[in-house]
Amino acid sequence: MAKLSTDELLDAFKEMTLLELSEFVKQFEDTFGVTAAAPVAIAAGPVAGGAGGEAAAVEEQDEFDVILESVGDKKIQVIKEVRALTSLGLKEAKDLVDGAPKPVLEKVAKEAADKAKAALEGAGATVTVK
């Protein structure tokens, strides 16, 4: 297979739809074991006492799904937040919101999941993190 230059790759990406690019990113992440999520810096708070020994024994989950359960009465604000979190187009974001319950983000870090949950709940949605 001929090696493509960076410019050729960028030209190919410019011709793809957002859905095609989203699928490409997912396959790229799976193939190379990386994530395209932007790192989020959050200061760690003090750990609550009493469960220190047990918490160390249980393996901590490191990937979370953000599930949009219901929209509430501020549908437009929720669509705007979904677009900001996922880089989806207007139609795709509206379809996702209309089809609730649906996952908004999958396999993201705890900090990113908590940030997304707070943003969506601030817009009036009901959200769970699994």
UniProtKB/Swiss-Prot annotation:
One of its GO terms (cellular component) is cytosolic large ribosomal subunit. NCBIfam families: L12. Forms part of the ribosomal stalk which helps the ribosome interact with GTP-bound translation factors. Is thus essential for accurate translation. Keywords: Ribonucleoprotein, Ribosomal protein. SUPFAM superfamilies: ClpS-like (SSF54736), Ribosomal protein L7/12, oligomerisation (N-terminal) domain (SSF48300). This is Large ribosomal subunit protein bL12. The gene is rplL. CDD domains: Ribosomal_L7_L12 (cd00387). One of its GO terms (molecular function) is structural constituent of ribosome. Belongs to the bacterial ribosomal protein bL12 family.
